[in-house]
Amino acid sequence: MSELKVDTGRLSHIANSGPMSILAYCASSILMTVTNKCVVGSDKFNMLFVMLFAQSLVCVTALVLLKALGYVQYRPLNKVDVKNWLLISVLLVLMTYTSSRALKYLAVPIYTIFKNLTIILIAYGEVLFFGGRVTAMELSSFLLIVLSSVVATLGDQQALAKKPLAAAVESILGLNVGYFWMFTNCICSALFVLIMRKRIALTKFKDFDTMFYNNILSLPLLMLASFMFEDWGAANIARNLTKDYIIIMIISGLASVGISYCSGWCVRVTSSTTYSMVGALNKLPIALSGLLFFDAPKNFLSIFSIFLGFLSGIVYAVAKQKKQSQPAN
């Protein structure tokens, strides 16, 4: 069984506070995005698999410590569950790797906006594989998502037009590579979510079971990929595994633990409706953090695309809640 310990002591007013859970969830999301961008956005860093390995290792270590302290419970490793969950871990590695590659080339606001395209793939995947349906309001949110992506692209082009020719050509090549990795990530993310839904029904996993198995099974896959595809020469290791990079990777890993923990916390002390709305609203501060901390395009189209992406998230969250409240046919 996987469960989260609820504090009933002196700090119970914090542990049961809706606003605190929402702030913690938003802060964790922003922290993870910003720290990841700090690492992958550097021209010096080229060991993404090592970064992902470090993040998964931090997650596993944190879960083991939390379990030892009695704050969480999760299912121990066993052959049957490992066999059933291995494909999910492979998809997780592909999803996180392509996400990191996209984040390397794209500005945080653009990355956040294009990430919404995954919602469309998942929705129609559920129609194909689970007999779901898409409501008119959901379709409206999808149109807003596509529109926000188009406007974001136009904003990028407007920013490029102001650069010298050589710099503009280099930036265009980088953006095209980023778009490729972003669309690949959307496909991997949709497959991950859709197949994981089936496997959760098979294994009866709870939240912390999923988190533990996702990360611990990813460790050997990530290390193998690193040894196969990355440069483990002394000079490259010295350039990549500096004290600053290691600290940022640890912080990012802890932030991912925080996101998972705060997700369950938020649902427990508020409601699934509030949580879904927070997920939609959280797109705005993440995108704005990219404008604040990094050299992202700052023109009308770029800002407007963030607003459209934010609006599409709200419309989609409301549409999902309305659909869930309707009686099944």
Curated annotation (Swiss-Prot):
InterPro entries for the chain: SCL35B1-4/HUT1 (IPR013657), TPT_transporter (IPR050186)
Membrane topology qualifier: Multi-pass membrane protein
A cellular-component GO term for this protein: cytoplasmic vesicle membrane
Transmembrane annotation, as ranges: 14-34, 45-65, 80-100, 110-130, 134-154, 175-195, 215-235, 246-266, 274-294, 299-319
Family: Belongs to the TPT transporter family. SLC35D subfamily.
Xref: PANTHER family: SOLUTE CARRIER FAMILY 35
Task performed by this protein: Involved in the import of GDP-mannose from the cytoplasm into the Golgi lumen.
Quaternary structure and partners: Homooligomer.
Identification of the protein by name: GDP-mannose transporter
Organism of provenance: Eremothecium gossypii (strain ATCC 10895 / CBS 109.51 / FGSC 9923 / NRRL Y-1056) (Yeast)
Organism lineage: Eukaryota, Fungi, Dikarya, Ascomycota, Saccharomycotina
Gene name of the record: VRG4
